[in-house]
Curated annotation (Swiss-Prot):
It comes from Nitratidesulfovibrio vulgaris (strain ATCC 29579 / DSM 644 / CCUG 34227 / NCIMB 8303 / VKM B-1760 / Hildenborough) (Desulfovibrio vulgaris). This is Acetylglutamate kinase. Belongs to the acetylglutamate kinase family. ArgB subfamily. Substrate binds at G67, G68, R89, N193. The gene is argB. Catalyzes the ATP-dependent phosphorylation of N-acetyl-L-glutamate. It is found in: Cytoplasm. Its main location: cytoplasm.
Amino acid sequence: MDCVENARLQSKVLIESLPYLRQFHGETVVIKYGGHAMKDEALKKAFALNVALLKLVGINPVIVHGGGPQIGKMLEQLNIQSHFREGLRVTDDATMDVVEMVLVGKVNKEIVNQMNLAGAKAVGLSGKDGMLIRARKMEMVISKEAQAPEIIDLGKVGEVMGVNTTLLRSLERDGFVPVIAPVGVDDNGETYNINADAVAGAVAAALKAKRLLLLTDVAGILDHDKKLIRSVNMREAVNLFSDGTLTGGMIPKVKCCLEALEEGVEKAMIIDGRTENCILLELLTDKGVGTEIVSDRAAQAACNCVLR
């Protein structure tokens, strides 16, 4: 491709993005950052540049990040045993100390540094800062057919009870990009490890964000033939639970999306974080790079049976 043809292609891409830039100008977009996109150096740099560009054109990104592999690596180095129940890390006091150290002290600051180098004014936060994420201990009960319900003690695993939107709005107005580590605190000062998808969904709901984006290590929601499902409404998404389409880690991600939509978020996207510039491709182009779940008020009642 010669220089002129390349310039024409670039101009076409810019024109295609114009209606989306208008649509999202001044709006909040919450992005859950995790998976391979946090490990590959090229993807890390692209992510930071994507976020910086969004802020530059008047869109307000709020980032919530994970860090499971980094936590696991540090626990192994410290010879602290760790195990999972129902996909959640059982978190005793020693594990909680490591979780907070890794997420807040290391991973969060690395992301903030990368974004600042890209030109964004990023500010690192945990749920403790300004009581940003109020939490409580998660209660988990597993019911199996013909068996008594099993109560699982996950230790210091929490669930979100409230979000300090005043703090986040203040940072947005002053031109900052909040970068949130998924550590919460209760009214007694107890610290909790919270699933990053759940925090992202709760933040999006509290801010009434225009979009919620969850970066994953798959193309999006796949059907039984392993083909990408590009768009579903809430009712269709609920049906994916009952027909067996959703399995493993995709189940809590879709639940998180539905909860956010139920609280007023317009669309939630599960996108392929392995694709360079996936955020810009999803938000500012016609096709996108994942699965969108669209708010459907008529379907909200059907969601209650899945979410509660």
